[in-house]
Amino acid sequence: MKTDKIKRVGLIGNTQKPESAGMIRKAARLVERAGRKAFVDGDAASLAREADLLLVFGGDGTMLKAARDIEGSKTPLLGINIGGLGFLTAVSSKDLPKALEQVWKGNFSYETRALIEVSGRCSGRQIRQSALNDIVVSRGALSRLISLDVSVNGEHITRYRCDGLIVSSPTGSTAYSLAAGGAVVLPTAEVFALTPICPHALSNRSIILPLNSTIRIQAMNPARATILSVDGEVVAELDANDEVTVRRSTNIVRLVHLADSSFLETLRRKLQWRGAYF
């Protein structure tokens, strides 16, 4: 990998984490020491226009926001974890100097991640939003089941009675979908995971669908609030008979994949897979 193209590095972080500012200052010094230019002022979108690489300090939530903010940009992201589990923030904060050395030496590749998109009319308002992890239609604060009518490519699947429904991207399979019983898929796989949340029918299981599918979800709840969330952020309420459509976005996000990192090794470590020994 040629590194002469990485001359300008943007640094952004989660301002809610006190350690973020200190880590950004440290990273800026390391970047400048390596003969590169560090940019620390501005939001993700403006920094992406200036930089050849964005370093993102925080947890997966910070990475998800950065990915949405720079949608349509080709500037790659490298996540530095100062949060919790951190599947997207692949580099531990203590390993930052080592990770940057790998970048300067060209020991990395770019990994393309698919974005997914939801569109439709919700409570009289037209919406269109992109997500890196997942799009969720779920019940509001009231602890009652909702009914969601779902079809794929025009073919009816079923009417779910559940707490909600997760449409996960390949990247998001290790997030909410996994917690709801969905399968883990490789982040480069060309699939959706359609996972019901606490379905009333035990036969309702997570379904893996091709990423070129068009998924339609219609709220069938005349007197109950139904919420649309994108990467964990509420974006709209659905009235009765409102419907949204989920499909692959035309945009992608590029992540930096360090040479010594592996998704399967990350699974073993983050999920504490021990295996069985007899």
What are the residue ranges of the model-derived segments?
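Catalytic core of DAGKc-family lipid kinases
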Residues: 85-163
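Short glycine/serine/threonine-rich phosphate/pyrophosphate-binding segments
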Residues: 61-67, 174-179
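ATP/nucleoside-binding phosphotransfer catalytic cores, i.e., glycine-rich phosphate-binding loops
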Residues: 137, 153-156, 205-278
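ATP/NTP phosphate-donor binding region
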Residues: 1-53, 57, 65, 94-109, ...
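Proline-centered loop/turn at the N-terminus of a beta-strand
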Residues: 74-76
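A generic structural signal for short beta-strands and their flanking turns/coil linkers
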Residues: 51, 112-116, 131-133, 144-148, ...
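Gly/Ser/Thr-rich active-site loops/lids in small-molecule metabolic enzymes
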Residues: 159-203
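A residue-level signal for conserved active-site and pocket-lining positions in enzyme catalytic cores
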Residues: 14, 55, 59, 81, ...
